Amino acid sequence: MKKIWKRVCTGLLALTTILTALPTTSVYAAETQYWTESSERVGYIEHVMNDGTIHSTFNEGHMKVEGETAYCVDINTGFKNGYKTRHDASASMSTAQIEDVALSLEYVKQYRGSHSNLNANQGYLLEQCVVWQRLSEYLGWQCDNVRAAYSEISQDIQNEVYAGARAFVQANKGRYKCGGYIYTGEGQDIGQFWAELNVGNAKVKKTTANEIVTN
């Protein structure tokens, strides 16, 4: 019996020695990477500064994350196709900022739905511009009136949309659940935002550029 026990102890000691000699590998949870791209050019943007000067004019691309629409959230940085890491927008934006951007986008989407004269590219340009306008006000870019070139979308339509978006935000704060994601990596960050009508708020306050109408 003593011989058997001795053999068992010797075997366990040998196994422990082998395991100790093996290299230790730390296991980390890999961060999910999302493919981001500027899939096509949709039209020209005029980077208008608050003093009225045009800082630059450029042909804007349609930003996408895994094929889904997204928006540039840093007008001062060039975009590069590639993989980016997704973060909840609340990690870098306040609740008020997220709500402002999300509701502005919601207004433009509703406007597009009722104005068939706008094509898909024009609609995207308007959405991208309201994102930049809201972020410029919060982040001090000094380009609160960035716009699509008037050759892309008329001044009258743009004025109506931008004024309407501001009115819609003021009329509907607290009526929607708003959120978003920011994708970071090499080059320009991009974002996605949404606004979902809260349960119990079935009546949405719609707006025009001049007045607020409640159904």
Language-model features: locations:
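Short, surface-exposed polybasic-aromatic patches that bind anionic ligands, especially phosphate groups
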Residues: 30-208, 213
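C-terminal segment of classical bacterial N-terminal signal peptides
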Residues: 5-10, 18-27
